Amino acid sequence: MMLGSLTRCRTAVPSQMFIRAATRFNSTTSSNVQLIESLNDFKKTVVDKSNEKLKMVDFYATWCGPCKAISPMVEKWADEYKESADFYKIDVDQAPEVAGFCGVSAMPTFLFVKDGKIVSKVVGANPKNIKRDLDLFTK
């Protein structure tokens, strides 16, 4: 369900447009981002060492404003880096055991995993640092 509407933004000031756009959050993901719903799934896909690709995990909550704002960028990166990285999303309210297992206490949190080990962690909607880590660990 879409909470915001861009049709009303035509006369809004830019800051209002950002707030309204951020309220649009679709929990579905592109075909290049997989949802993880359990600790067992997390261990099978992210911790698995057989795949040498970088794995980026986005821990989010549906009520989290910064999570909503950065979600379109995550989708874009998933398309851009699809050959060199796998992308996952975890709703911390639906899979709290995964958040606990990873020590995640703030949203959004982005974990970068390579060869079954966490190589970097970005807390907050910080596109510059996320992009930096994607570039660094996909080379």
Annotate each predicted stretch with a short phrase.
Residues 105-106, 111-139:
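Non-catalytic, surface beta->alpha helical segment in thiol-disulfide oxidoreductase systems
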Residues 58-60, 112:
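Structural cue for short, hydrophobic secondary-structure segments
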Residues 36, 59, 70-97, 104:
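Thiol-based oxidoreductase modules, predominantly thioredoxin-like and allied folds used
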Residues 53, 60-63, 106:
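Short pre-active-site segment immediately N-terminal to redox-active cysteine/selenocysteine motifs
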Residues 64-67, 110:
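The canonical Cys-X-X-Cys-His
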Residues 35-54, 96:
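A short beta-strand-turn-helix
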Residues 1-32:
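N-terminal mitochondrial targeting presequence
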Residues 43, 47, 75-82, 88, ...:
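Amphipathic alpha-helical interaction motifs in eukaryotic regulatory proteins
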